A protein has these predicted regions:
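N-terminal Rossmann-like NAD(P)+-binding domain of SDR-like oxidoreductases, especially those catalyzing
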Residues: 1-151, 171, 191, 220, ...
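C-terminal substrate-binding subdomain of Rossmann-fold SDR/epimerase-dehydratase oxidoreductases
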Residues: 4, 23-26, 163, 167-249
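Residue-level signature of the cytosolic catalytic core of signaling kinases
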Residues: 5, 154-158, 216
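Residue-level detector of alpha-helical hydrophobic segments embedded in or interacting with membranes
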Residues: 54, 112, 158, 241-244
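A glycine/serine/threonine-rich, flexible loop-to-helix segment
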Residues: 105, 158-166
């Protein structure tokens, strides 16, 4: 994927419990061989095309990865755990985009909120959620699903709002604000997201869906204002930064 960078994994490469395999989740033979070779008992499915704007200009990749790729993983898990000798858990990482959009006066999404995807990305994730549920109901595959809000944190690809704004501020480029910037999003730090997923894997109930949020609901314009204040303070505290970012206002 264009958003992946193997250098982000450098700190893990010498760990005995870590193995890096470059492949495609749509490669059924590869996935089946990995499940069998390593006798995997927990599959956590993070892999996805996830940028809404890209899904609008090019939805095919989202259908291929998010729907067909998920189905490939499910087929491999079924073969190894249901039809074969293994036994395990398939955890599916999804998004709150499947529920649609929130207005200022709306309550937070619940696990029972009806699906109302508004973009090809959201629709592809909604479809994958339903496939995961179907494999549980039809074949008895042990599954859990989590629907998270907007993630942020280290190494995030700079097409997402927070890293893109930070780069644009430092480079003196216009900030990516759509309309009046009043769109409300909940922001979830990536480590908090991972802790929640670990809790679901350890204590979750098979077949259930769990919403994961950061309790940080902000309008996009407010997020941008916070970032501007942080950068401004950094330049105040460390004046020499200006020579590295001469175009920053």
């Amino acid at each position: 994927t264009y958003a992946g960078n193997s250098h982000n994994l450098t700190a893990l490469m010498d760990k005995d419990q870590f193995k890096f395999v470059k492949g495609n989740i749509g490669d059924l033979a590869l996935v089946e061989s990995l499940l069998a070779k390593h006798d995997i008992d927990t599959l956590v499915h993070f892999a996805a095309e996830s940028h809404v704007d890209r899904s609008i200009s090019g939805p095919d990749a989202f259908i291929q990865t998010n729907i067909l790729g998920t189905h490939t993983l499910l087929k491999a898990a079924k073969k190894h755990w249901i039809d074969g000798p293994g036994n395990g858990l398939f955890h599916h990482v999804s998004t709150d985009e499947v529920y649609g959009s929130l207005n200022v006066s709306d309550n937070a999404f619940l696990e029972i909120t009806p699906y109302a995807p508004n973009s090809p990305y959201a629709a592809s994730k909604a479809a994958s959620d339903h496939l995961v549920r179907a494999y549980h109901k039809t074949y008895g595959l042990n599954v859990t699903t989590s629907n998270c809000s907007n993630n942020y944190g280290p190494f995030q690809f700079p097409e997402k709002l927070i890293p893109l704004c930070l780069l644009n501020i430092l480079q003196g480029n216009p900030l990516p604000i759509y309309g009046d910037g009043k769109q409300i999003r909940d922001w979830l730090y990536v480590e908090d997201h991972c802790r929640a997923i670990e809790l679901i894997i350890d204590e979750g109930k098979f077949g259930e869906t769990y919403n994961i949020g950061g309790n940080n609901e902000l309008a996009n314009i407010d997020v941008v204002n916070v970032l501007c204040k942080i950068i401004n303070q950094k330049f105040t505290d460390t004046p020499e930064m200006k020579k590295y970012y001469p175009n920053s206002p």
